């Protein structure tokens, strides 16, 4: 399939090509166009033309990803940019128009025939097209991912994951991905009455949030399992948590603000990080412990928060996310050999510390009623853990 799709790439060169990559093949940023991608592991750059057309091919599954960039005057809408591709490749398509980052966008399931020449029988291909408007009238970004029609179901999660992890501006790092936004639109906000720190608080959550976040978890878990016997499993695992974190950011933000308001005392700001960490740890430690060994074994974060239940992963990630939203530095620590996850926070205190990026983080055991810094001896060794870093808004303030 790879040779065939390199030919397909050149055949439609006026339609697709690649960008100025300043990071690895999986994590890319284009300084000239201002967008970024965090592709699943093992996508390899197979071809490019300038900084406008790229072809990536996956090393495990037969999936291709083509990227095309167009100057702003070429089209008036994201739909027009997508229709340019539909016409050139003679695609049949089913469109889902939606709004992402306050701009009209288009997601389309597509199918088309391809043959490198008349000597070859046309082959049926299936996939997805995502068309986005870049900020500041920079231009249009169109992504096409596809595979053989008979492989479409097997490869769908990988294809969707590659499209859903695109970033077009600073705040898009904290925004539900475009594909999830299109497929799981907001429905109706509801108010949650909640008890935190012996206080009654309330916050809003959308009725679609739990299902949408669960869909991301299930999809990314499916992608993650491809790497179980591969050298880059840890990198894939880190990406798994980062994508869930990103999707949940806006879904959890109203709750984090309510918690912050209940804790913050403008007349006594000293020790706020320690206070917030202790209270959030107490909250998640009192969740009901539940696991779903049949699936991803990970409770979606909106449901974990509102229903106060989940396992170590969901509790620890929820705690880290809420601390980050209060501008408190925290990391997720995951131990494959111990099948465990904990939060770790940069705040005053004593106990088991983990050093990461030159900082010391106190371990937070979310599934036992112990204070910050108390981690069981049998799992406390640093070599048992790998860290997961997340984007924070302050990282982009100087950009």
Language-model segment annotations:
Residues 26-49:
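N-terminal "mature-domain start" segment
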Residues 10-18:
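Bacterial N-terminal signal peptides
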């Amino acid at each position: 399939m790879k040779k065939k799709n390199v030919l397909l790439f050149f055949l439609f060169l006026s339609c697709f090509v690649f960008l100025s990559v300043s990071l690895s093949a999986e994590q890319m940023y284009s300084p000239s166009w201002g967008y970024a991608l965090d592709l699943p592991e093992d996508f390899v750059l197979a071809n490019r033309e300038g900084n406008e057309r790229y072809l990536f091919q996956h090393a495990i599954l037969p999936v291709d990803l083509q990227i095309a960039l167009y100057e702003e005057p070429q089209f008036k809408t994201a739909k027009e940019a997508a229709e340019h591709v539909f016409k050139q490749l003679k695609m049949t398509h089913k469109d889902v128009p939606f709004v992402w980052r306050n701009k009209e966008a288009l997601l389309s399931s597509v199918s088309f025939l391809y043959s490198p020449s008349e000597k070859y029988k046309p082959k049926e291909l299936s996939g997805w097209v995502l068309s986005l408007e870049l900020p500041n009238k920079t231009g249009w970004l169109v992504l096409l991912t596809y595979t053989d029609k008979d492989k479409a179901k097997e490869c769908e999660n990988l294809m969707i994951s590659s499209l859903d992890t695109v970033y077009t501006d600073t705040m898009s790092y904290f925004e539900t991905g475009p594909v999830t936004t299109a497929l799981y639109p907001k429905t109706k906000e509801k108010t949650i009455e909640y008890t935190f720190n012996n206080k009654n608080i309330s916050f809003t959550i959308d009725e679609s949030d739990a299902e949408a976040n669960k869909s991301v978890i299930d999809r990314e878990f499916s992608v993650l399992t491809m790497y179980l016997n591969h050298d880059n499993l840890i990198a894939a695992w880190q990406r798994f948590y980062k994508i869930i974190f990103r999707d949940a950011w806006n879904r959890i933000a109203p709750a984090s603000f309510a918690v912050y308001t209940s804790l913050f005392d403008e007349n006594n700001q000293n020790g706020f990080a320690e206070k917030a960490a202790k209270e959030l740890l107490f909250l998640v430690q009192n969740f009901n412990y539940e696991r779903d060994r049949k699936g991803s074994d990970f409770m979606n974060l909106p449901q974990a928060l509102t229903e106060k239940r989940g396992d170590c992963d969901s509790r620890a990630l929820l705690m880290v996310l809420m601390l980050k939203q209060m501008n408190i530095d925290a990391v997720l620590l995951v131990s494959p050999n111990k099948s465990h996850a904990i939060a770790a926070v940069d705040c005053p205190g004593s106990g088991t510390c983990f050093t990461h990026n030159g900082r010391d983080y106190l371990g937070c055991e979310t599934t036992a009623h112990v204070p910050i810094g108390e981690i069981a001896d049998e799992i406390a060794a640093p070599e048992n853990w790998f860290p997961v870093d997340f984007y924070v808004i302050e990282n982009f303030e100087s950009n």
